[in-house]
Design a protein with these regions (language model features):
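Helix-boundary/low-complexity linker signature
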Residues: 1-324
């Protein structure tokens, strides 16, 4: 279980905690659409408009709730699972609301500069679980016969029209889910940084994946490359300034932190033609009671995710075990 920090996008279905649950209607999206119309948004064609409202008034999905407490670090973000629809921060007069950022984080919107979440401050997060009807009906089959492009534009328009916090969070969650289901987005799509891959890394990637056909085979081969016994995890190691590159890591030092392993994996995977992204986050931390998690800096980690057709964004672990 991971709280995604910097991935764009990040797979949402891996959060399936058996915590306190409650029902919340997906008509929240329909309500957000009505608010969008009230603010001057463009009305959809009548048949689509009616289907949209009827559909989401009738579909419900279980919402899970978790209570989270960062125990030894301050933060300007409220760490949260993907598909978060609501957060509640207790006892903070300087926090007026919360907003999703373009990285899927929950960020405090404050009335003072540099406000941050202090250690041991607890907050709650409500988020959707994975529901097949919601996922396939909304994404794979399309919404009310709208094209993917039209629906994407609608979500963007709704976000940009100045929705209330509740509607904004709802629409942003749907936009994130939409983005997750499309693995062939152009390189110019917002949020995807493109990196030059050296010929040295391309040659190594080709040798690792030679003779392999399927994406999952290539991803597993690249993961196995780091687990051949020659790499070591060393939290205190620092490469020479003039050699702090992925090429030096895989070919010479073979020592580093999770960031080094994840970065090298991503470059090798991208060179092999895989759809991959680098993720930093925090695992679920120490469970205090049912639904309550304490998260410390020791729970931080970096890892890659590869999009595997039929399975979605899949976590791989190139980082080898270490003494730290």
């Amino acid at each position: 279980w991971w709280f995604s920090k910097t991935a764009v996008p990040s797979r949402m279905c891996r959060f399936n905690w058996q915590n306190e649950a409650k029902e919340r209607s997906l008509s929240k999206l329909a309500n957000a659409y009505l608010e969008y119309l009230d603010k001057g948004g463009q009305l959809l064609p009548e048949d689509i408009d009616k289907k949209m409202l009827d559909r989401f008034a009738a579909v419900e999905e279980t919402v899970h709730i978790a209570y989270i407490k960062p125990i030894n670090y301050p933060s300007v973000y409220l760490l949260a699972p993907e598909r978060t629809i609501d957060t509640s921060l207790y006892g903070r007069s300087d926090v007026t609301s919360t907003r999703r950022t373009d990285l899927g984080e929950i960020m405090t919107d404050t009335t003072v500069n540099n406000a941050f979440l202090r250690p041991n401050e607890e907050y709650s997060v409500d988020f959707y679980g994975r529901n097949a009807a919601y996922s396939s009906g909304y994404i794979e089959s399309g919404l009310c016969n709208m094209s993917a492009e039209d629906f994407y534009e609608l979500l963007i328009d709704m976000i940009n029209c100045g929705l209330s916090d509740d509607s904004y969070s709802t629409v942003f969650a749907f936009l994130r889910e939409y983005n997750n289901e499309f693995s062939d987005l152009p390189s110019s799509f917002a949020g995807f940084e493109q990196y030059d891959i050296s010929e040295e890394m391309r040659t190594l990637s080709a040798s690792i994946t030679e003779g392999l056909t399927y994406d999952y085979e290539k991803a597993e081969a690249i993961e196995a490359f780091f687990n051949d016994g020659s790499f070591s995890y060393d939290l205190g190691y620092r490469a020479p300034t003039d050699k702090d590159t992925p090429e030096f890591f895989v070919n010479e030092s073979r020592r580093g932190t999770c960031s080094d392993f994840a970065t090298a994996f991503c470059l090798l995977a991208k060179a092999a033609g895989l759809n991959v992204h680098y993720v930093e986050g925090f695992n679920s931390g120490e469970i205090q009671t049912v639904g309550v998690y304490n998260i410390s800096t020791e729970n931080a980690h970096a890892f890659p995710e590869v999009y595997i057709a039929g399975a979605g964004w899949t976590i791989y672990e190139p980082t080898v075990s270490g003494n730290s």
